Amino acid sequence: MCLYIRSLCLSAAVVVAGLGPAFGQSEPLVGAAAFGDWRADMPGLSRIIRPDDLPKPGMTPSVANFPHIIGRAPNSMPQAPAGFKVELFANGLSGPRELRVAPNGDIFVAETHAGRVRVLRAVDGSSKPSANRIFASGLNRPFGIAFFPRGNTPQWVYIANTDGVVRFPYAGDLEPSGKPEIIVAELPSGGNHSTRNLVFTPDDKRMLVSIGSRSNDAEGLVRLLGDLQSSWGKYPLGASLGTETDRAAVLAFEPDGNRVGTFATGIRNCVGLAVHPASGDVYCSTNERDGLGDDLVPDYITRVREGAFYGWPWFYIGDNEDPRHAGERGDLKGKITTPDILIQAHSASLGLVFYSGGMFPPEYRGDGFAAQHGSWNRSKRTGYKVIRIRLKDGFPTGEYQDFLIGFVVNDSEVWGRPVGVAVAHDGALLVSEDANGTIWRITH
């Protein structure tokens, strides 16, 4: 019986119609109703979480509730809204994570734990790649991928390792056109968060690199506060020091690797990094901190303002003080930038892309898609899906919508953990998941 199994029992490798809109839902879930868990998920269901909706810290215990990963059954498929078609595009990959599509349509896949980047080639409209090659290997936990300069004929593929950035000469082929070059020899590494993402600003003058925090909540920083207090003014607003120096931040470099500053601070773990194609705004998809209960702290997706401070570790979602750092940085109160879109806490928001294709209905153009890897620090499982980020006139509304679900089997078992999202050359949406090593293609 499949009544409560979201990976529906389907006999083919294709879902043609998808699922209808959230039982006729016309208004988004708000307040406590928006927190929910995986059982409430449904393609088309919308949520809005506001800062005023947040509970007090410690209202529920902090729990360890790791998922049990199982193999994907042949008839287990993700589901999208009605009118969309879901197909298995590629399988047998080694933990595929970030996805990036080159101007010629080639699909670059970071196989992070295998230390390599793979490239898949598929003609427009094809449901399977016609070529599958290793583009680069021997890398150190690669994640972010970017093409430079912008336009139809980039000359370089930049790859962010966990401890630096390299670039490969590129002529649109399935392999580099020359030897790699080290661009940033050293990035902060070690600790809890190893992903490094990168994008170029719309004018191609700066390369932005996101660096996650070393720890959950800067647990060791309190011991250094006395020594560092006189130094805060010498650093960017809200910058972390000590073992967290240049962590929980977006750093800025010139394309040749010369460091030119810190773009933003206090972003605990900006895994997804994307530039909106119309506005040019830089966005982060962010994993927030653990240990404060089921519904704290919300993950978020936000525009990243240059020079802004987003709270970590002292504050969260505006002026809410983390009780584990009470009284440490009162000087920062009132200086925190509140994120744009709050997501169910512990969802583990990862890859981010803005829809720029022509295949989906017109109302999707310019909206975002974000992969939710799934919770472990929540008693009721959440995440394990792809969400649509709603924008209006180029600005985030705070609303997000379940778009692709079906990776959870029951309260303890999951077969898929979404990581990367990308728009294919023909306008299809591509989604990677690293539990069973698959990439899915969603068309309309």
Which sequence ranges carry the predicted segments?
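Beta-propeller domain segments
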Residues: 27-81, 154, 195, 213-261, ...
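Beta-propeller domains
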Residues: 78, 104-129, 173
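Beta-rich catalytic cores
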Residues: 85, 95, 103, 113, ...
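Surface loop/turn motifs at the tips and blade-to-blade linkers of beta-strand repeat domains
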Residues: 88-93, 134-140, 183-190, 262-266, ...
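Blade-loop segments of beta-propeller domains
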Residues: 92, 96-100, 116-150
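Hydrophobic beta-strand segments that make up the repeating blades of beta-propeller
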Residues: 107-109, 155-159, 206-209, 282-284, ...
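Asp-box/WD-like beta-propeller blade repeats and closely related beta-sheet repeat scaffolds
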Residues: 132, 136, 141-148, 155, ...
